[in-house]
Regions:
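Extracytoplasmic metal-acquisition and chelation regions
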Residues: 1-150
Length: 150
């Protein structure tokens, strides 16, 4: 919301004649985000386990804003996942009853197998969509489905 206010104010200064359109778009965006936030919180409240691990360094903001229980972050490349590291990953996920493992891309088959063996669910989120609000909505939906076991 706040960043949208700043951007809208800048746009009005650059294009004063478009002020009514800019303000209408800002109001629509804020309403969309408010509804999205309320819907997401309601869905989160029904999840039994909010523990996650991220194999990407892209999602700190998302994890924090949803108040998820972050067990760990390990953004190492697929080539650095040794058999011992994969065993440790599986153990960490099992020991901490991690519901969802987040990534910004499909990991290697070996990493997928380690996640599956632990009983956690892999959720691959988008990081480069053209529409950031739609991307956020889609990512949160995928994450909430993963947390609920859907």
């Amino acid at each position: 919301g706040r960043m949208a206010d700043v951007m809208a104010a800048d746009l009005v200064r650059l294009a004063p004649a478009d002020k009514p359109t800019i303000e209408a778009n800002l109001a629509a965006l804020k309403q969309r985000l408010l509804k999205f936030s309320a819907d997401s919180e309601a869905r989160l409240a029904s999840a039994d386990n909010l523990s996650v691990m991220s194999l990407s360094d892209h999602f700190g903001y998302l994890i924090g804003s949803l108040n998820l229980e972050l067990i760990g972050v390990d953004p190492r490349p697929d080539t650095e996942w040794t058999p011992e590291a994969l065993k440790q990953l599986t153990a960490t996920l099992k020991d901490n009853d991690v519901a969802v493992v987040m990534h910004h891309r499909q990991p290697s088959d070996a990493v997928k197998a380690a996640i599956a063996e632990s009983g956690s669910r892999l959720v691959v989120l988008s990081t480069d969509a053209a529409d950031p609000v739609a991307e956020l909505e889609g990512n949160v939906d995928l994450l909430l489905k993963g947390l609920s076991g859907a």
